[in-house]
Amino acid sequence: CELSGKVGTFRVKFTLPEDNDSITVRNIIINRDIPFRFSLLRMGVFLALILLGYGIVHSTLLRRPCHQEKLFVRASAAVVTAVCCLGCVSLVWADTNRPIQEIFERESGNQITRELVDAFEAGQVSLETPVDPGLLAMENPYDWSARSADNVNAQWDHVFYNGRYYSYYGIAPVVTLFLPYHLLTGHYFPTQFAVLLYGLIGVVFLTLTYLAYLRRFQRTLPCGMALGGLIVMQASSGIWYVVARTLFYEISIASGFACVAVGAYFLMTSNILSRGRISCPKLGLASFFLALAVLCRPTLAVYCIAAVVMILLALPRAGKHPGVQLAAGKQNAKRIAYLAWGAVPMLLLAGVQLWYNYARFDSPLDFGIQYSLTINDFTRSQFHMGFVFIGLYNYLLAVPKFTWTFPFFFTEFTTLHINGYY
């Protein structure tokens, strides 16, 4: 504990699980000296940021426009990206406590790395995990309190529908990584390295998207500002939380991040948002990867919606060719081809998702989240507008808390009674 001011006496109370339990106090230390800890890495990061800030203000090179120092901007971006990738590898490696060969020869896995793989290999969408008869007999199997009271064995965070287990989580990482790996090797791909792989792809393409944005919209931005913007963008990315805790939940997040980053890069370089000739093949790749992100994590459909709006806004330009006057028929043909490149990949993958939903839950629009076996009974969840304003406040307006310990400030933590917090 940390005490301040005048402290005369204090009492320590231990609460044990059972009445006959005991605890042994071996020693009590008061006023122990706080150890002096010096982190070279932390000081190095602070020093680099200070030097960067000084250089932005005073350096002639860093004040030059990006388009005049293309090589410097690319080299600096490569260094920043390499450092970020090294940081991701370090975080994953620090949590790795077994030989690499043993890790990549796993005979077991989790809901995504093993259960979905086994189900797909068996030609079914339901999981092969056996269901406890007690769960089948329950009036409301989604009531966590009732399951606990009846001592019913239920697979945590699995979807339970019509007497079978399913998985809510996206199938894209299963189809693109885990299933092929198991078919080729007979082993299950490790979760932590799957998260790392997708995280590295996302980090690299996030930088490439940023550079493509600079070339098209911020050519006169000073080099120092451009470099600082890249650092802020990579540092504020949520991928750091993902690679620091590589559970199966993070597979969907990391793979979705990678697909969105790749899709954003091709969307930016297709020139539908900027001047120049529109590249339909790149638009097709953007459509494919953004749709694939939805098959990683359904909530990422918001990026597809945004992409559709951008594609439609660029439709008038799609029928034109720079410096060439085309006939009306050719313009319409080019617009139709443009729409096909943008729509077909997205519609095909949307069809896969809709079929997968119907095969599991008898409705193409039902993703199954309400059938999850977790703490909350999602089948009886309600929407309250007041929670929207609470979320807006906590994410946009809440003032951070400051402390005397590193990193010296934290986000506000708001508790919403049972099982809810920001």
Task: Give residue spans per PLM region.
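Membrane-lumen/periplasm interface segments of specific transmembrane helices
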Residues: 90-93, 97, 317, 337-422
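Specific aromatic-rich, kink-prone transmembrane helix
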Residues: 255-275, 284, 288-290, 304-307
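Perimembrane helix-loop-helix junctions
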Residues: 303-347
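Interfacial juxtamembrane loops and adjacent helix segments
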Residues: 122-169, 210, 233-244, 374-378, ...
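Start-transfer (signal-anchor) and selected internal transmembrane alpha helices
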Residues: 41-111, 224-226, 330-345
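Transmembrane-helix motifs of polytopic, lipid-linked glycan transferases
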Residues: 190-219, 262-266
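Membrane-interface alpha helices of multi-pass inner-membrane proteins
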Residues: 261, 282-297, 304, 345-353
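Transmembrane-helix signature of polytopic, membrane-embedded enzymes
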Residues: 206-238, 258, 275-282, 323
